[in-house]
């Protein structure tokens, strides 16, 4: 439970930026490209370091990465509200990115190694904590700014630091002995490469949604509070999809869930873009539930493909997810500057469909470790 709480708080801080970006865009007179660069700095700093820190954790079991990473993420994001200029904003966002890069590998590794009977379900529950944090991030940002102005982000600093202190207990209560979890199974590099590519394509669609949905809704005439609230609904239903996808993959297999999630989720998201009013909000929520259902399944499948390198593999998957998504945010911003936000969403939604096409080449399985591992 402490890991789920820590994941929720960590990812809440990570997604504060989504709710604050419309304000910084006005405050610093940013184009969509420069707004996308803010998201990209966070994404690139975390994605470049995450696989390296994951590999280091697999070899050394360095315990302080978990709570230290959360504390650094919290520190950087809590201070963004008092950024005097754009350069300082980029520096603080980059600092937070380093923190989340340190947090995730030991957290993923602990979950994967401590749950063997139903990896998909356990990973889904753990990842739902992160999605819950993503859901809360824009809402918390909107409420704080409405009540206290941008400097209200400082009020979150004690929450993050207290949670980091609580994670010290994970050292003795939830972290397994690595010597008891070793396997002789070599990593399935071909499968890992395919999963990383699917992750990258999927993340392009999702990251531009996380970053630009509030801006899109504000451009449509909604207030910042309504825009961040509606965007959070997308992420909130994604929490349920994350849990459902993980448990369903334990029953019917990993590949069917991933294929359905990417094809159907993208189709529903296009429906959101084509409609207005209540129907549009319902379709947006449904697309979140379906699109996010694939993430826990992909991470589980990757950890099964390399059981002795879960930290490195989870870092690779999340690094691809955050890094490519961040680069996509910059590209999306440029496209939106030229063609408009709605046209840019139409273009970038197609990447999830590309991920769905590649997922057809994943091995057939029944959700157990062996069926994944024997595929060459």
Q: Where would I find each of the regions flagged by the language model?
A:
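Residue-level signature of mid-helix packing/kink "hotspots" within the transmembrane helices
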Residues: 15, 43-51, 134-135, 235-243, ...
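Helix-to-loop junctions at the C-terminal end of transmembrane segments
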Residues: 49-61, 241-253, 336-337
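C-terminal transmembrane helical hairpin of 12-TM major facilitator-type secondary transporters
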Residues: 252-298
């Amino acid at each position: 439970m402490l890991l789920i709480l820590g994941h929720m708080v960590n990812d809440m801080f990570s997604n504060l930026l989504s709710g604050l970006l419309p304000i910084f865009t006005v405050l610093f007179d940013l184009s969509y490209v420069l707004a996308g660069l803010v998201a990209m700095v966070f994404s690139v700093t975390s994605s470049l370091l995450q696989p390296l820190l994951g590999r280091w954790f697999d070899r050394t079991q360095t315990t302080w990465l978990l709570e230290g990473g959360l504390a650094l993420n919290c520190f950087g994001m809590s201070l963004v509200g008092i950024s005097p200029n754009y350069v300082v904003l980029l520096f603080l966002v980059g600092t937070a990115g380093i923190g989340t890069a340190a947090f995730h590998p030991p957290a993923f590794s602990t979950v994967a190694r401590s749950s063997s009977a139903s990896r998909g379900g356990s990973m889904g529950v753990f990842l739902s904590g992160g999605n819950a944090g993503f859901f809360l991030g824009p809402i918390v940002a909107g409420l704080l700014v409405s009540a206290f102005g941008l400097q209200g982000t400082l009020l979150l600093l004690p929450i993050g630091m207290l949670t980091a202190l609580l994670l010290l207990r994970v050292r003795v209560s939830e972290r397994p002995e690595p010597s008891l979890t070793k396997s002789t199974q070599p990593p399935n590099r071909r499968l890992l490469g395919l999963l990383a590519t699917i992750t990258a394509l999927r993340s392009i669609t999702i990251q531009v949604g996380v970053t630009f949905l509030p801006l899109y809704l504000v451009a449509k005439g909604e207030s910042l509070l309504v825009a961040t609230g509606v965007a959070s609904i997308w992420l909130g239903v994604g929490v349920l999809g994350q849990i459902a996808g993980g448990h369903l993959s334990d029953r019917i297999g990993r590949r069917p869930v991933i294929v359905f999630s990417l094809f159907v989720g993208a189709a529903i998201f296009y429906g959101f873009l084509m409609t207005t009013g209540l129907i549009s909000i319902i379709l947006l929520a449904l697309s979140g539930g379906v699109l996010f259902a694939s993430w826990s399944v992909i991470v589980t499948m990757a950890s099964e493909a390399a059981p002795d390198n879960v930290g490195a593999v989870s870092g690779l998957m999340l690094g691809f997810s955050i890094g490519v998504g961040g680069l996509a945010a910059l590209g999306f911003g440029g496209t939106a500057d030229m063609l408009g936000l709605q046209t840019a969403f139409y273009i970038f939604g197609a990447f999830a469909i590309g991920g769905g096409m590649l997922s057809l080449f994943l091995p057939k399985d029944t959700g157990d470790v062996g069926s994944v591992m024997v595929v060459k």
